[in-house]
Amino acid sequence: TTYSLSKPQEFLSAKALARRARQQLSVDSTDLPVCAKYVEAIRKQGVRIVVTGKWDNFVTVSCNDSSRMARISRLPFVRSVEKVWQQPTRKNKDKALKRDSITDKVVRVDSLYYGKSYRQIQMSKADKLHEAGFRGKGMTIAVIDAGFHNADRIKAMQNIHIVGVKDFVNSSCDIYAESSHGMKVLSCMGMNQPYVMVGTAPEADYWLLRSEDEYSENLVEQDYWAAAIEFADSVGVDLVNTSLGYYA
């Protein structure tokens, strides 16, 4: 690799390094990006690079010719090759997402500061944390999910501080036109509309990351998730909410 552990600022953000120092977590060889020469050698076999993972040292590619995978398996630095994805049917592919209309009907609960979230807040004792001054200020949270449908257009969510978004499933997709699950998860934490809905961390900053492909169930989603969690670490997030689970 062209990177060096003596220069971690070349592959980790200043915020990530500050968090590591604060938590006494050293930078080690697993933090080094996947060797660029290896990635390029794989690309030259006629495949498209989808994601890479430095912690488990993998490269995920896409191609429609199994002979290319056979050639890749013979490269001296490749330990093994595994099929992790299959093209979904046309029916599933055509499910793709259109922005539907938004009903911006704000429902106030004038007797409750937390609005619709009061039960969850009371159950988790988050109101006590808020009273003590812990409202998420200064913290960065990554939400790894299947999509954040219309979170950028819902008026009640406009004061959630989103610092960035990234799609690991398909970089050409609109992360705000995908599944609504992540939007709902985000609202439980980031909403900050008194008497409508106040979440558990209304003053935090948020990264929105998509790793779940709701149109198919394939092992590649574990690769997407690994790439997303590595990215979250590299930009220095403090916490990750990932309402997803996989098994081998």
Regions found by a protein language model. Give the residues of each.
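Structural motif
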Residues: V51, A70-S73, G133-F134, G199, ...
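Inhibitory N-terminal propeptides of secreted protease zymogens
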Residues: T1-I102, E214
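Subtilisin-like serine protease catalytic core
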Residues: S80, S117, D127-E221, V235-D238
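Short acidic, glycine-rich surface-loop motifs adjacent to enzyme active sites
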Residues: I229-A248
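Solvent-exposed, polar/charged alpha-helical surfaces in well-ordered, non-transmembrane soluble domains
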Residues: A36, E40, S67-A70, D127, ...
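Protease zymogen maturation seam
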Residues: R74-M139, N150-A156
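Soluble non-cytosolic domains of exported or imported proteins
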Residues: D28-P33, S62-M69, R119-M123, G138, ...
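Short, ordered loop/turn segments at secondary-structure junctions
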Residues: Q86, S211, G245
